[in-house]
Amino acid sequence: MSTLSGGLRTLSYEAFLYFYPLVTMDVTRLQAFNSPIGTTPGSGPPNRFSHMRAFPTADFRAVVRPNFDTLYSSAWLDLTAGPVRLTAPDTEDRYYMLPCLDMWTDVFANPGKRTTGTGAGEWVIVGPGHHGELPAGLDVITAPTPYVWIIGRTQTNGIADYPAEHAVQDGYTITPLGAEPEHAVDSNYDLKTEPLKIVNGMAALDYFDYATDLLSVNPPHPTDFSQLARIAALGIEAGKPFDASRFSADERGQIEAGKADALAAMLASLPTLGTSVNGWTVMTDNIGVYGNSYFKRAVVTLVGLGANQPEDAVYPLLNVVADGDPATGDHDYVIHFDADKLPPADAFWSVTMYDAEGFQVANELDRFAIGDRDSLTYDADGSLNLYLQHTNPGVERESNWLPAPLGPLGVTMRLYAPKAEVLDGRWHPPVVQKA
């Protein structure tokens, strides 16, 4: 290995980034497979949905920046024993989507209102290389990997809408067309540590050993040849065991340093992950499907595993207000939308308030988000003001009030099925002004 020592750090850096989504997805999958049913979305045996039946409460801490627009229906597919049939009910024009992610975090299919409409739907999902008879008359979706994560979302119009929402969720079904895959629970698997902490805490050589095993099960994308050819110098090749003993102590140090470099670079890139405009960061390209942008794919895994394609949802994040300072609950703010500049979405839009850690905070209205499905008050000219502040602005403005906690604020706008002007950059969220 001495002839490669000078490049080991760089190769380790590249390999860590390349495999980061795959390893993180597998840890997430195994936590779900080994968790009791209903513990987390998607938990329990494969090939069945687990539904979130209500919005998160004020003390919910399972995930950061939860949404209050849709309820989740999550499932992990195991296609190793054969295809499955996926069904969705007639949602009667209700917005829904069932994005299917491969183990590299690419959304390879997304049945739902935007793509297939809201009538009842049926699809067969097959694993890579499948050969065999399939039911006639059904659309076939070929998964790039034998394991698939479906992160379904269904529009919810407040608590009173839950019964109708639950009826739609109950209409999502997964039926194996062959034998049930084997499912043995590992009672010793770590279910308490979040997947990112597990992955980031792995020693580099253990990480690459794990990644090599996964590569033998989950085919790389067809355009990955060049990257795989480079990292083969580390001994990472599908179908071959990874031999960590071949490296000297110095080489091990360089490999570990490459992993550390990769993590540091990912964290350093966060402020520039999207386009910064009017104090907001907006990502409208190269997300959900990444091609050969391995660095972007890894960073999105770090900050938003399971991200949608921008055609389905865009999430502007507030960084600073008009004076260039971050928003805090010590000040009152206004988001003003001109009548012709309201958030352009074919489905719906919202603004959600979090604290600095990305969690909702209890308030007198039990309101954590506000949007176009709420009873908002518009000005006579059709424009709209949203009031972001800690104290109640009074009865005349309460309908447009998004309560804010004290301290640093985390504000996220969500546009579902955004229109073309969002995706091509003609529309931007407005500058947030101090009141």
PLM region descriptions:
Residues 1-435:
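A compositional/structural signature for long, glycine/proline-rich flexible linkers
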